[in-house]
A protein has these predicted regions:
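Short, cationic-aromatic polyanion-contact patches
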Residues: 3-7, 60-79
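Pre-recognition alpha-helix immediately N-terminal to the DNA-recognition helix
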Residues: 9-14, 26
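Short helix-to-turn junction characteristic of helix-turn-helix DNA-binding domains
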Residues: 15-19
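Short acidic, hydrophobic short linear motifs in intrinsically disordered regions
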Residues: 21-31
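Short, hydrophobic-biased segments on the C-terminal half of alpha helices
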Residues: 43-47
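Glycine-centered, phosphate/nucleic-acid-interacting loop/turn motifs that mediate DNA/RNA or nucleotide
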Residues: 53
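Short beta-strand "wing" residues that participate in macromolecule-binding interfaces
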Residues: 57
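Amphipathic alpha-helical dimerization/coiled-coil segments
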Residues: 78-107
Length: 107
């Protein structure tokens, strides 16, 4: 599974949060106020996500509706495994040691 750049991941997080097929307009409405993107930029990200196999697109009247093909949990698992492999050389022990900085752990 391809790793997503932050901008595309932001779009996918919105789609996963809405948990239904969505239009570009619904995605734009959910974006952070300080992070407004132009409609063409959002469409560009959606097109890339479709090319990468993360989204399917269907026509609904005049609008395109975007459907997640990869669920959040699958992506997060793949991303976690990738981080563990790339940074911690597949060692959960090294990963846990990096999280623990000498202070007591809390819940």
């Amino acid at each position: 599974m391809k790793r997503l750049p932050d901008s595309e991941l932001e779009i996918m997080m919105i789609i996963w949060d809405l948990d239904k097929p969505v239009t570009r307009f619904e995605i734009e409405a959910q974006m952070d106020q300080g992070r407004r993107l132009s409609p063409t930029t959002v469409l560009s990200f959606l097109s890339r996500l479709q090319e990468k196999g993360f989204l399917a697109v269907q026509k609904s009247g005049k609008n395109n509706v975007y459907i997640a093909l990869i669920d959040r949990e699958s992506y997060m698992q793949a991303e976690s495994r990738s981080i563990l492999k790339r940074i911690y050389r597949n060692s959960a022990r090294n990963f846990i040691a990096a999280l623990y900085d000498g202070d007591s752990l809390s819940d």
